[in-house]
């Protein structure tokens, strides 16, 4: 079911206005439906039955009201059936006989296969709602219930009956959660929990507000405050309870608690109060632990950066040369030395100089780390107390425990017997140093960096965390995988044996390597120590395209942003999707728009209130809190994209299965703990990673930390879009790794990276393969096919876990990044990824059309980023950037605003082209395909916003009493 169809489900009567697309979708009939219609006697009966069939297909309900029947629909039905449409009054007169109305309703149900819900199906619906209740509010559950009924060919019942089922599901969830809490937590502890959240702190704020607050920065003081929160939660024994309650349920009740002022908590009745408080404290422990680990990782990175800043970038060869010259001068000054002895001394000096190896920069940085460890020792003392876990023995945990024991003794000298070889040979010399105080500092640094690496690859974890749990949590359990593996292999369309998968891939790699060698022989490619590819020539602007663009701009004209939003909403009804129903008033509709604009532009709630005089800043803040919940904005964004792709012009823009993804940095302030310094603009920023279709439009957006690998986010955006099929995703260098290329292929699509570094353009073939001499410098025969075959099942196991939603691609790629080197699954994925990269690069090197295609789709991503920058012109406020869910709302709202602008431009361009086509003025598709829907020149994004709602009331607010009625009323 498409997103745009959802808004029609459950409608009680026909809308006052219906588009041509909707009439064709719902009121066009196939053979069996036509036979049933033509079996009726009389044109009125035929039209009436056709109306019932179309309405049931559109809304899932039976049509019982005939107050409004649009003229266009009545005319369309007549043309569809080839009969003259009579007056609507005759239809109403016919249905005054109840038997006729009932008969037509029953025939419509029979033809479309609908039936009334049975008691068994009602219980199934309650179970479905029970599964969805943790992640949805009441209005969204109402939509899910209607979708479930429609998909199962059940007539959608009255809204009141569905809301009764929703209330029962919510009550059942609350009772089950309350029972589980009461069974695992003693009453005295629950009393302590309830009392603790309402206690006042010395600064006047409640414990509830303090626990929920996000850190301002990643400073030592902020880390200490986060540790203080964890200590408080440990004091309350939160870490000992509620381990069996799912994370989604914890999140639901925690967010419900913080949505109200702390003073309102006393008014909440039991067991709801206990459920909310318990889930809130447990969820706070999860999020605070994640914050601590991220801040510690950032602090360690800062420690390395500060040490590296004091070390010269390269070896000072000039100083070494001067030293050698000085020694030579000293020898030559000794005139009394015989020539033979002088020659021997010179040879010895040269030999000694050649053996003298300057220290590497990394070793100098490590020495600087050892010297500078004291300022972060208190941090190491604190994190040593946390309950770190590992599968089996792990050196990071072992030596963290030894350091903790030494801290408790107050000792700052390392015992002689501690040499810590398992922490790595690079630290061995420093830890074995005779200076045991310095050896102690070296052990601290080695343990700190070993812990950082282990947390990144998932070999060490903390159980009460959302993002840093063990790597085993990424996979299905072994029992489940053994039972369901065949189903997942089939779902991923993968063979059970790696050899079957590798055979066509190896043939493609061999053919690709031969093609690259042929291109090198012909001079198309230049190979020395690296492979050099000539840049594609820039495309010249076609004068006909410029002329067409100017003509379209002239016909479309200028418009205000409110007009654009209303025009798109009238077609898509994204406000209905966000609300889960029709807006009840104009003010509620404006609050939806204000919530989108306050998140999707740099306007604050106060500034939005100035631009929308009908609303207050308080109501806009309320709309912002509501809009960012439960991914409402992303659902609306998806619906607008579907509307945009329906236009015929979209087919001229490119392929439907090709997309690109890229990150855009958004400036913020230093008082945001997840902000990183943008290397280009040297400002604190947060990244927003967006996926753009080749046919334009954003289909996924996600906030991301700058300077991190983006491959996981790139993959996540594709696999979470079930309605869009993407076979190739173009990314830049930061959006790929070898493991990510193999993971993406197992998930059903190809990563196509535009590689910046020449070293990344090397080709790889299996061991023992003969490499053509022309490309021997850039082709390595070191791929271990046997390793891929050995761990094939584990690679598919991980892909199936990600595809099913058991784990996210972001988490999987974070655990299987460079920190996982040496892990057999990681190494197998890298080997497979190198083969896939070779096959891709071979096409990229020799096929200019393929290169042009990737350049085009990546440029479209950049153009969309430019559009988003024009919409969001300022900084992201600290209030919106401190929590992931708030940043997700910014990303989704900005994508929605950009999609609205592109959808409006698309519809206007299509309307102009249709008018020209009606006048037999045909425009070649190759010219239309070069006109982008990202124009902003004629759209005013600023000023006082006046929304002409009355102009679009028939489509957006059809049930409003004072809305003008369009259509035929008899």
Curated annotation (Swiss-Prot):
The lineage of its organism: Bacteria, Pseudomonadati, Pseudomonadota, Betaproteobacteria, Burkholderiales. Belongs to the transposase 7 family. Keywords: DNA recombination, DNA-binding, Transposable element, Transposition. It comes from the Bacteria. GO terms for molecular function: DNA binding; transposase activity. InterPro entries: DUF4158, Tn3-like_transpos, Tn3_Tnp_DDE_dom. GO terms for biological process: DNA transposition. Required for transposition of transposon Tn5271. This is Transposase for insertion sequence element IS1071 in transposon Tn5271.
